[in-house]
Amino acid sequence: MSTEKINVAEIFGENVFNDTVMQERLPKKVYKNLKKTIEEGKELDLETADVIAHEMKEWAIEKGATHYTHWFLPLTGVTAEKHDSFISAPQPSGKVLMSFSGKELIKGEPDASSFPSGGLRATFEARGYTAWDCTSPAFVREDAAGATLCIPTAFCSYTGEALDQKTPLLRSMEAINKQALRLLRLFGNTTSKKVTPSVGPEQEYFLVDAEKFEQRKDLIYTGRTLFGAMPPKGQELDDHYFGTIRQRIAAFMKDVNEQLWKVGVTAKTQHNEVAPAQHELAPIYAEANIAVDHNQIVMQTLKRVACQHGMKCLLHEKPFAGVNGSGKHNNWSITTDDGINMLDPGKTPHENTQFLLVLTCILRAVNMHADLLRESAADPGNDHRLGANEAPPAIISVFLGEQLEDVLEQLISTGEATHSLKGGKLETGVRTLPELSKDATDRNRTSPFAFTGNKFEFRMVGSRDSVASPNIVLNTIVAEAFADACDILEKADDFDLAVHDLIKKYATENQRIVFNGDGYSEAWVEEAERRGLPSIRSMVDAIPAMVTDKAVNLFERFGVFTKAELESRAEIQYETYAKAINIEARTMIDMASKQFMPAFIKYTKTLADTVNSVAAAGADASVQKEVLDEVTALMGETKKALDALVKVTDEAAAKEEGAEQANFYHSDVFPAMEALRAPVDKLEMIVDKEAWPMPSYGDLIFEV
């Protein structure tokens, strides 16, 4: 194991074209112009871009870069890139120069026809554009290809529609900035110039041995196991969570941290998660668009470094049945450029009128658009996880904690909030331990949307998904709530009276969304139904929320999406679901036909030979015969279920693409997949391990 010491302060951000590098390398005027673009949205002229491009190129070459790429996030859910070298056409001498222009920096032209567009673009309409997002720093990535200058960009069509996640994210950030500033001005704040959503996504993942991974076609093709019986031990002892990190995993984490720190990702926390072989990495907060980029870098780095350590990183939400799946807690807050966190309640929240207005606006936003928030976490893999006593329920509710709930109860019942519950001190009963301050409220891990001191934690997001979508929705629905509140308060004759009445009104009208209890309980499901809260269990049930009149009006009002963009994204979501389930079904068919059935046939022959041999020796062969009969019966069930899955999968392929096909995959194909898995998993508990054609769950999650 390497004992080489790392000086984090020295290496952090060394491969990032950050503010320090720009100040050092750019002429003062160019630097000021770029900062105006970053901070105020001023347009960048080509002359300035040329200077920036030249210095960026020189800096990247010093880092060993030979190529650059416009690094963007199309609607595939994973980053895309095309690499171009810095070399220009050869000179008469035969030598080449290294060049990179301002035009090449600010705009690229990838073929848009091969990316999902949901009908926005025909196949022959190939032109698309990438545009430099100068608010997210460029960085040099080091990998097997060498060193590449990665330039974060947005991606749009020839006619201007967003074909990516970043464009609407930036639009939503503009929306909440504008409306939050309106709200701050009402409270006399004249100093804050910009309000930015801050995001800190906690990334969960599994690690398995690469050799064992390569023996599982389901993991290779789908990212999750489609067959597999539980080993004798799972997670029931709670001994993996926060347990001692194994040496192999620790070495992996060390390399991950080093690579992330070099590209400016503030990897902060790492630990074992609940399930065996499951782990978590969490960064420090960053501005939303940078946090989204950083999370993509985190996922890429986890996968790349795992391979270097002879492992595979699984980012699927549910790679193994029977143990916890993986999510990505999206910690969200809104902060000003001069350091004000608008979600900080202070020591006496009942006296903090601005905070109470912000809080009740957020309650209104979540209550009005719970379906949209749920849709933002919709993913085929997440269907296995949500509502399964390991992740938040599929019902959106807000946890506020005792202190804030008490303040709102006072407002609702009496019209005045006169006090806030205090935290006090925690008594341990041990004199040698320090006195600990006790928070005013506990935490609730079963809540999908929880207030945790000075931020909200949205816990529904899937582990492999970009955090762009939930933050687009959060930013936009809160911008709407702020805008509506400002429309009322800006017209008020008596601001203090009007804001008091509005806080009480919002608290009362949106009380149903607040729930501080056990989100895993069946009682909550019944209570939520009585409250009229939507319970959306599957991705296909969630997708329609994107294209309701309410959603279209919301997103068009704040310039985040057009109706056409929303319709295209809904279409892509349906296609994504259908394709994912189709691949899983075809993989199950392939594995059952080519691996399991041949193995079962061989094993029944072995059992039959054993029965005959024992009987021929004059001994009692009833036990052997009983095992043979059981295996034969389960093999028959497997063949019947396999034929049924083949039939229904072919039927699904013939359905019209879109909602009809996706719903058929959900209602008919997925249950047929479960029906095939059941007898195979039973057989795994009977068949000789030497005869089983692939590594078991025990091999995968306990031998890494």
Task: Describe each PLM feature range.
Residues 126-315, 324-327, 334-571:
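Glycine-rich, acidic/polar active-site loops that bind/position phosphate-bearing ligands
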Residues 220, 295, 317-318, 344-348, ...:
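Composition- and surface-driven signal marking solvent-exposed, interaction-prone regions
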